[in-house]
């Protein structure tokens, strides 16, 4: 972890935001002013596929708002009935934007599509494993069957630099395609244990699913599978390992031994040639020049021409770039105690709820391998009492820092060795049950694990099993691995900062909040998440759980809720029931009075297809707040988009003291906000000060999108609020990559998915005793 002093230099804003230009990764596409189409009514979109197949090659077919639009691609073919119209591109940009998705592939016939929409293809000359192995001086007969190839995606998107002026751009993104071509038999003969690894079809036919399942065993010429998608066994020549980073790591570390790290570092250098700021910017420039060489044919006598780079600026009528005010961390209810940096403020003022925190003498269960007792006791002493003045990063200790009276550790040794990989979870749970039988009430748990145990599958993982047991008893837990316990003091002091914050939050404490708008009576920010529960990746039938986290406008955590498990068809009803109950409880708790102005902001990461969650929660809010003046906003906050922002004025920082390498070059400052459309903003939440390595890829911004039915429509306010909520993660002193409304929901979903595999697990207590706890941190 970087020293806390480095965090104190964050969020420079140079140059002045009004003059700032942010270069995008896209190019404007010049299109005809209008096109001739045939339009007919088609209320049922399920019939589009049939029509598209019938007209393929002659007509481009696009469904929009209950109507089917036909654009002639070439003469001949089947006839089309409907109304002939001339439509203006500026008013209907979605038609040619959709056509561009197909036309880009047709314009680049030398590149085979690995994905149709957006058109995605692989570099033809560059393969990075071979280059990395050469740079590292490594060789192995199977290395050339491991491939890492740059992958380009071209995404046509509509953007609106000024209200009423819509344009279409093509945005370039670059990823990496990992592939393992080696035969399973060769890998097996090289000593690689393939059991449990995912395999895919070596040759995939149209309409076939690529994933086959996981390897149970290989005998004769057959691969025996479990968690299979279809067949329980396949011929060994028809399958290959999935090109995942996990499979790469398992295979290459086995093949290369201690030299694997050398290859990994060299591969990191190779990938940086495409993904760090200046290199990415140059790759995008070259792609734009390539695309601009000739027109892109859209239809009969209709072409598109790739033009200039799209730049967001504040020139002319456009006001597309601004810098949000710095986030202030707040440590009391009046707002008088505030600081620019979380740890500095916490050290100076103590936690936000220090005067009202109820449990000043918490009892914490500590579960640990008995052979590590001395080392664990030293760690606990440093955590509780501090490390002294020589280690200013954690000199005080948890008790003084949080204003507690004392902390009592209830020690629970477990007779287990790191070599015990099958029965460790049983021994942990048995030790806990024996200890708690006569230990009295405990308020939190610390579970210490050997590194080997922490990496075990969930069905044998001691941490997941102990978490299941203790959560059922209403006790939140914190995991600590032995390498963390054994850290050198100069590193341990910063780790203990994060550990103390998360532990206090799990005890229902509030370390800090943020400054917020106090002009209204009440403001709630509601995070909405979704957990898809299944036994494995290959299981077809899914069950869903709605996850809700509720915060006050200042970021105070109010409560969490996990809905009942349901089938896909019942998800709408489950959300309606859950949200109505939550809002009714908060209305009573916050004492909403008739005539009060109450703002409710919903954050979602990825709305479920064919379920209009926004309409459901708006309906619930109107019902519960019928006596109040309700302002509602439904905001989607996502990293899943093709937009990148580049600040060419940013020269970056030294990667480390005395280094000539620089990190964060071309990264926009934290809080830079760029308009993409009337209801959309790009929000930079990273910065050179938060980037750790010179090879770290240029960070992508968050896309903040406001639902058009929202009654509160200040998108810039909502983008700033999303920024503030990235500063509310109580897992670290540093901001998170996403707002905690999203981050916490994702964390809960991940843990629910893992806990699902534990026998007798029940989430009931999460809505009762742990309703106000951040048990998931």
From Swiss-Prot:
Segments for region (PIWI domain): 510-777
Gene3D superfamilies: 3.40.50.2300, Ribonuclease H-like superfamily/Ribonuclease H
Cofactor: Mg(2+)
Keywords tagged on the record: DNA-binding, Magnesium, Metal-binding, Plasmid, RNA-binding
Segments of this protein annotated with the region Linker L1: 108-182
PROSITE patterns hit by this protein: PIWI
Pfam family name, one: Piwi
Domain Piwi: 445-757
Region (Linker L2): 244-341
UniProt note: phenotype after gene disruption: No visible growth phenotype. Cells no longer have a 15-19 nt population of RNA, transforms 2-fold better with plasmid (plasmid silencing).
Residues the entry annotates as binding Mg(2+): 777
Region (Mid domain) location: 342-509
UniProt GO MF annotations: DNA binding; metal ion binding; RNA binding
Effect of residue 529 to D: Does not reconstitute DNA cleavage
Cofactor mode of binding and number, as noted: Mg(2+) contributes to binding the 5'-end of the gRNA.
Cross-referenced InterPro entries: Piwi, RNaseH-like_sf, RNaseH_sf
Superkingdom classification of source: Bacteria
GO annotation, biological process: clearance of foreign intracellular DNA
Region of interest called N-terminal domain, as start-end residue ranges on this chain: 1-107
Effect of residue 506 to A: 10-fold reduction in plasmid silencing, strongly impairs gRNA binding
Protein family (similarity comment): Belongs to the argonaute family. Long pAgo subfamily.
Note from the entry: Argonaute in this bacteria does not have endonuclease activity as the catalytic residues are not conserved, however a nuclease is encoded nearby in the genome. Restoring the catalytic residues to those conserved in T.thermophilus (G529D, AH604-605RD and E746D) does not reconstitute tDNA cleavage.
Record text about domains: Has 4 domains (N-terminal, PAZ, Mid and PIWI). The N-terminal and PAZ domains are joined by linker L1, the PAZ and Mid domains are joined by linker L2. The domains assemble in 2 lobes; the PAZ lobe consists of the N-terminal, L1, PAZ and L2 domains, while the PIWI lobe has the Mid and PIWI domains. The PIWI domain assumes an RNase H fold but in this bacteria does not have catalytic activities. The gRNA:tDNA duplex lies between the 2 lobes.
Name recorded for this polypeptide: Protein argonaute
Source species: Cereibacter sphaeroides (strain ATCC 17025 / ATH 2.4.3)
